[in-house]
Amino acid sequence: MSGIGWQTLSLSLALVLSILNKVAPHACPAQCSCSGSTVDCHGLALRIVPRNIPRNTERLDLNGNNITRITKTDFAGLRHLRILQLMENKISTIERGAFHDLKELERLRLNRNNLQLFPELLFLGTAKLYRLDLSENQIQAIPRKAFRGAVDIKNLQLDYNQISCIEDGAFRALRDLEVLTLNNNNITRLSVASFNHMPKLRTFRLHSNNLYCDCHLAWLSDWLRQRPRVGLYTQCMGPSHLRGHNVAEVQKREFVCSDEEEGHQSFMAPSCSVLHCPIACTCSNNIVDCRGKGLTEIPTNLPETITEIRLEQNSIRVIPPGAFSPYKKLRRLDLSNNQISELAPDAFQGLRSLNSLVLYGNKITELPKSLFEGLFSLQLLLLNANKINCLRVDAFQDLHNLNLLSLYDNKLQTVAKGTFSALRAIQTMHLAQNPFICDCHLKWLADYLHTNPIETSGARCTSPRRLANKRIGQIKSKKFRCSGTEDYRSKLSGDCFADLACPEKCRCEGTTVDCSNQKLNKIPDHIPQYTAELRLNNNEFTVLEATGIFKKLPQLRKINLSNNKITDIEEGAFEGASGVNEILLTSNRLENVQHKMFKGLESLKTLMLRSNRISCVGNDSFTGLGSVRLLSLYDNQITTVAPGAFGTLHSLSTLNLLANPFNCNCHLAWLGEWLRRKRIVTGNPRCQKPYFLKEIPIQDVAIQDFTCDDGNDDNSCSPLSRCPSECTCLDTVVRCSNKGLKVLPKGIPRDVTELYLDGNQFTLVP
């Protein structure tokens, strides 16, 4: 090939790589396939909507999965989405605001799910939606504001549900509707104004319902006769003498009511609020009672007029954002004896009438900032029998009317001064059964309880030893002293993690510091020292430098460095990370792995090196990683593995070598026997060379078939010569012209940009 040809090829490759680099930030969700602006995740048995959907997505296929809930954050930021396919899942709940960001949405399919109710104003942000399929669900009612905001809908399918109530005005905004299917439901009555505002309606199906043809439905007969091409086969199901008659054929005089009903000819569709009661619960007198029903999540779309919700003795784990915000009249909320471990900061937002909140007997460890903000009417707050280990100083700042606060039986070691200052009406407080450290930082509490003898449960000190088991309210102030160790411990336990300074551009929640998707090229300074999980994925790292940052993070257990551009890890980069047990380096640009890269990771159990460019695994690549149990080298460019490469991984129980182009020559013979003996490999890594072994599992190849015949002696683990002996090399240019060569010379540098082979004796293209 001529020099010009190679230069052209080099330029083309550079251009392709440039384009790929620009596309890379639009990562495709795991398991899904992406093409252009289409993301296809159908039929993958997904239980939740996958994360990291590219922001430029215009079509998203999620049909045929096992998704049960659509949260308000699942589609956040997808402002270009036009087509959303959610049919054939198990969706029973859609949170308010779930489609708020979908400003360009045109088609939405939710058919064949388990929807019983959907929130009012769900489609408020989808002004361009023109096709909506909700058929084959279990929808019972269509509330008045169901389609508010979706003014452009032309095709609405609601057939094969259990609809028995359509509130007056439910379809009022749909003036451009052309297709409406309501067949195969439980509809008995419709208000006279239901369809009068649809001048473009050309397809209308109402058959197979329970229409009761009394005086209130006489209007429908006239309406259908005026439109002979729509509403075909719409029949009466009652009264008995009209059963089976086509509504359009029944005469006006036959639509009769009892004497008592005659005076109410102008029938108005009833409120559907009675139908908003979850199937497992009972609803009466504005009380929703769901006690002991095995619920795993908060029921949604309850009657907005409720004043009390009883959800105790269930298996609820998470209280999502705005879970109760629609219920402005709520006065009492009981969530005791569940499994709650996660509370959204705005879980109780807007509950200005709430006076009783019961949360005892759960697994709450921390109260998010602003959790009780705006609860000005609250008088009773029971947080006992949880695992709360810290209180923010402003946790109760709006609870001016609180009478009783129970923090009994938690994990509090200290309470910051001023935490109870806003509780002007407090009469009773329970603080016992907490492991209080009675040092100088808790002196204020003793003074507070001396002045305000409201603590009635007998709160006692656990440490230091000199004050152990003594009642806090009875200890003299001078006894509360700090030694160095106690001072450090109490300072840590008295602060909640989210209150501490978070690095710029990062997000901090609990012990997780999330610095992903911020275009970072180095690890931020001042990572909180109690960080347990550090997320640095989806950034611009090229080299992981040895800065000593991990020496300052004694609690660190997991580091995520996936989806960067890392080509090298400096020796000592992980120095000090002795407690880390999981590192994710998936989707980077590492070409080799050396033991010096992982120095300091004595406790590492999981090492993910998927989707890099590794070509060789040497016999010292993983030296010092004796605790590693899971090692993934999936989807690299590995052609060979040096004997003994995994010998130092004494704890290894899972090894993934799939999707690599293994060259099954004499250098790989040892691996087949090793795989058969160890039985720890995932799947069946296969040979790709030589040709007669292509796609055969390595462990199935006979030892005598691992040969280096016919010039197949490549070993990517051997040091590469700088230049073939037959050629001359200058920088990245290799000249082998007019050398009488019959085969391609060995030892051509991997970084070659120009290769001259003209004037030789090749009979086949090398």
Swiss-Prot record:
InterPro entries recorded: Cys-rich_flank_reg_C (IPR000483), FSH_rcpt (IPR002272), Leu-rich_rpt (IPR001611), Leu-rich_rpt_typical-subtyp (IPR003591), LRR_dom_sf (IPR032675), LRR_TM_domain-containing (IPR050541), LRRNT (IPR000372)
Cellular compartments per GO CC: axon; cell body; cell projection; cytoplasm; dendrite; extracellular space; membrane; neuronal cell body
One Pfam entry name: LRRCT
Disulphide bond pairs: C281-C290, C438-C461, C440-C482, C502-C508, C506-C515, C664-C687, C666-C708, C723-C729, C727-C736
Domain (LRRNT): residue spans on this chain: 31-55, 268-304, 493-529, 714-750
Domain LRRCT: 209-259, 434-484, 660-710
Signal peptide: 1-30
Keyword Zinc-finger: no
Compartment(s) where it occurs, according to its Swiss-Prot or TrEMBL record: Secreted
GO molecular function per UniProt: chemorepellent activity; follicle-stimulating hormone receptor activity; GTPase inhibitor activity; heparan sulfate proteoglycan binding; heparin binding; identical protein binding; laminin-1 binding; protein homodimerization activity
PROSITE patterns for the chain: LRR
Residues bearing attached sugar chains per UniProt: N66, N186, N560, N619
Residue stretches of each LRR repeat: 56-77, 80-101, 104-125, 128-149, 152-173, 176-197, 305-326, 329-350, 353-374, 377-398, 401-422, 530-551, 555-576, 579-600, 603-624, 627-648
Domain of life, per lineage: Eukaryota
Keyword terms: Chemotaxis, Developmental protein, Differentiation, Disulfide bond, Glycoprotein, Heparin-binding, Leucine-rich repeat, Neurogenesis, Repeat, Secreted, Signal
GO biological process: aortic valve morphogenesis; apoptotic process involved in luteolysis; axon extension involved in axon guidance; axon guidance; axonogenesis; branching morphogenesis of an epithelial tube; cell migration involved in sprouting angiogenesis; cell-cell adhesion
Main location per the UniProt record: secreted
Assembly information from the UniProt record: Homodimer. Binds ROBO1 and ROBO2 with high affinity. Interacts with GREM1.
Entry function: Thought to act as molecular guidance cue in cellular migration, and function appears to be mediated by interaction with roundabout homolog receptors. During neural development involved in axonal navigation at the ventral midline of the neural tube and projection of axons to different regions. SLIT1 and SLIT2 seem to be essential for midline guidance in the forebrain by acting as repulsive signal preventing inappropriate midline crossing by axons projecting from the olfactory bulb.
Protein name, as recorded: Slit homolog 2 protein
Biological source species: Rattus norvegicus
